[in-house]
Amino acid sequence: MSSLSTSDLASLDDTSKKEIATFLEGENSKQKVQMSIHQFTNICFKKCVESVNDSNLSSQEEQCLSNCVNRFLDTNIRIVNGLQNTR
């Protein structure tokens, strides 16, 4: 992957600059979602998995993890929707 210098970016037309800015915003959003999911999974793993004795999780552990992460995601979606409605 090649890198762009400041002079390269300055020489771009406004449309290209906007496209790059939009792309970067999208990538930042994706990164934030991935970080949140990682954080939720980590919290839920600590909550749901008491010990690692096997290479597989028990059905109770799997269900707990799934429910836990889904509740975190549901909560975040409600918060985002609430924030958007207040704007």
UniProtKB/Swiss-Prot annotation:
Q: How does it sit in the membrane?
A: Peripheral membrane protein
Give the UniProt subcellular location, in the record's own words: Mitochondrion inner membrane; Mitochondrion intermembrane space
Instruction: Identify the keywords attached in UniProt to this record, alphabetized.
Output: Chaperone, Disulfide bond, Membrane, Metal-binding, Mitochondrion, Mitochondrion inner membrane, Protein transport, Translocation, Transport, Zinc
Q: Which InterPro entries match?
A: Tim10-like, Tim10-like_dom_sf
Q: Which GO terms describe its molecular function?
A: metal ion binding; protein transporter activity
Pfam families the record matches = zf-Tim10_DDP (PF02953)
SUPFAM superfamilies associated with the record:
Tim10-like
Q: Which cysteines are joined by disulfide bonds?
A: 44-68, 48-64
Q: Which GO terms describe its cellular component?
A: mitochondrial inner membrane; mitochondrial intermembrane space; mitochondrial intermembrane space protein transporter complex; mitochondrion
Chief location category: mitochondrion
Q: Which residues form a coiled coil?
A: none
User: Which superkingdom does the taxonomy of this entry point to?
Assistant: Eukaryota
The record's Gene Ontology biological-process terms are: protein insertion into mitochondrial inner membrane
User: Motif (Twin CX3C motif) spans which residues?
Assistant: 44-68
Domain comment in the entry: The twin CX3C motif contains 4 conserved Cys residues that form 2 disulfide bonds in the mitochondrial intermembrane space. However, during the transit of TIM8 from cytoplasm into mitochondrion, the Cys residues probably coordinate zinc, thereby preventing folding and allowing its transfer across mitochondrial outer membrane.
What is its quaternary makeup? Heterohexamer; composed of 3 copies of TIM8 and 3 copies of TIM13, named soluble 70 kDa complex. Associates with the TIM22 complex, whose core is composed of TIM18, TIM22 and TIM54. Interacts with the transmembrane regions of multi-pass transmembrane proteins in transit.
* Similarity annotation: Belongs to the small Tim family.
Annotated function? Mitochondrial intermembrane chaperone that participates in the import and insertion of some multi-pass transmembrane proteins into the mitochondrial inner membrane. Also required for the transfer of beta-barrel precursors from the TOM complex to the sorting and assembly machinery (SAM complex) of the outer membrane. Acts as a chaperone-like protein that protects the hydrophobic precursors from aggregation and guide them through the mitochondrial intermembrane space.
Query: Which protein are we looking at?
Result: Mitochondrial import inner membrane translocase subunit TIM8
Protein encoded by which gene: TIM8
